[in-house]
Regions:
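Acidic-glycine-rich active-site phosphate/pyrophosphate-binding loop
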Residues: 35-46, 127, 164-168, 221, ...
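Short, hydrophobic/aliphatic alpha-helical segments
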Residues: 39-55, 89, 168-172, 317-327
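Conserved phosphate- and dinucleotide-binding cores of soluble alpha/beta proteins
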Residues: 203-204, 210-366
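Small-aliphatic-rich amphipathic alpha-helix that forms the alpha element of a beta-alpha
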Residues: 49-56, 62, 273-276
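N-terminal active-site beta-alpha-beta segment that forms phosphate/nucleotide-binding
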Residues: 55-232
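Short, glycine-rich nucleotide/cofactor-binding loops
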Residues: 40-44, 175-181, 261-266
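Short beta-strand segments
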Residues: 27, 65, 107-109, 171-175, ...
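Positively charged, low-complexity intrinsically disordered leader regions
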Residues: 2-45
Length: 366
């Protein structure tokens, strides 16, 4: 299983540098599952568009893409001194930061790249540019380690809940899988670590919400779990309560794009209603979150900006003919906020946090 799993991860590397290290090589996730196509991004406009149009998506993967994007585009800056170089670098940073307003990893990665440049400012510009590539590589490597740690902690929860001879039922929403990170994913990491620890794909039964309107659960999560050999069922978002009531779901794992200091968590639209259902049916609900997604400057969910997306995603994007009348107003937020009191725990790479979350974040030095 290890070789098969390694081959799978190699096939679906989300973001990497080109062999010449002059561009980003990404999977265009808007084409999945029907077409698996890699595209090369070299300009800041191409990178901005790829993030904005969800060709690369998922908070950790966005952070990695932004870091590499900043390194690649900074490499082309022509400047006489560090001051001029830094001015151009900040312009690139601010431009890339405008692509997605909710994913805090985007800003975290860009700020980290800026700080690395400042730390090298007394050295030659060639050295500064090389340092940016080094920092981006480090961000990617750290993301792999972070996802693996989250997976180990989540796998520990699965082991406690699994009954001998029966698959454990897991529900997830949207895609917080390996396609959303450098490797393993966050919400899917416990499943992949289970395989690494010797479980069979049939020891788990993962139920994927399709995740309207962009269908990340159907197009991406179901795609990658099926390819990894894990028993997978796809359902419409409004079918989750039937599954929970029937006793088929034993635990819920989702990812997130930003966590407020009180534990309120922004994730793909529809996550909050899954948490409400899980609470009603007594099912543990866990957010899987790298500590970089915890925004200590954000007091609660009311302060998390929510991206509004195109009405076409709801009315006509997936259909041969328009499925709603012309002129109808469309409400299409990309995210919702799950209230902290609905969350059983937040699994970070440093440990599992419980309410009161601010105290646990401090205990783990997040």
């Amino acid at each position: 299983m290890h070789k098969e799993l390694d081959d799978f991860f190699e096939d679906v590397i989300t973001v990497r540098l080109t062999p010449e290290r002059d561009g980003l090589d990404i999977i265009d996730q808007t084409l999945l599952p029907g077409i698996r196509k890699r595209i090369c991004l070299r300009t800041k406009e191409e990178i901005w568009n790829a993030i904005r149009e969800l060709k690369v998506r998922g908070a950790p993967a966005i952070g990695v893409a932004a870091a590499y994007g900043m390194a690649v585009t900074a490499d082309h800056i022509q400047a006489e001194d560090f001051s001029a170089f830094y001015h151009a670098l900040v312009e690139i940073k601010n431009y890339l930061a405008s692509s997605r307003p909710t994913a805090v990893n985007l800003f975290w990665a860009l700020n980290r790249m800026e700080q690395r440049a400042l730390a090298e400012k007394e050295k030659s510009l060639d050295t500064v540019k090389a340092a940016l590539f080094e920092e981006a590589d480090r961000i990617r490597e750290e993301d792999v380690a972070i996802s693996r740690n989250i997976g180990e902690l989540g796998f520990g929860l699965l082991k406690k809940l699994k009954k001998e001879g029966e698959p454990i039922g897991i529900l997830t929403h949207c895609n917080a899988g390996t396609l959303a990170t450098a490797k393993y994913g966050t919400a899917t990491a416990p499943m992949y670590l289970a395989l690494e620890h010797g479980w069979e794909g049939t020891d788990m039964h993962v139920y994927c919400d399709e995740t309207r309107p962009l269908l990340q659960g159907a197009r991406l999560t179901a795609y990658e779990l099926c390819h990894a050999g894990i028993t997978t069922t796809l359902q419409c978002d409004n079918m989750a309560s039937v599954l929970m009531k029937s006793g088929k779901i034993h635990i819920v794992f989702t990812g997130c794009d930003r966590v407020a200091i009180n534990g309120d968590s922004a994730n793909k639209i529809g996550t909050n209603q899954v948490a409400i259902l899980a609470r009603h049916y007594g099912i543990p609900f866990y957010i899987c979150a790298p500590s970089s997604t915890i925004d200590k400057s954000c007091p609660d969910g009311d302060h998390i900006p929510i991206e509004q997306r195109s009405p076409d995603e709801v009315t006509q994007m997936w259909y041969k003919e328009r499925m709603a009348p012309e002129g109808v107003d469309v409400f299409n937020p990309a995210f919702d906020v799950t209230d902290h009191d609905l969350i059983t725990g937040i699994i970070t790479e440093k440990g599992v946090c419980h309410a009161p979350f601010a105290e646990d974040f401090a205990r783990l030095k997040i």
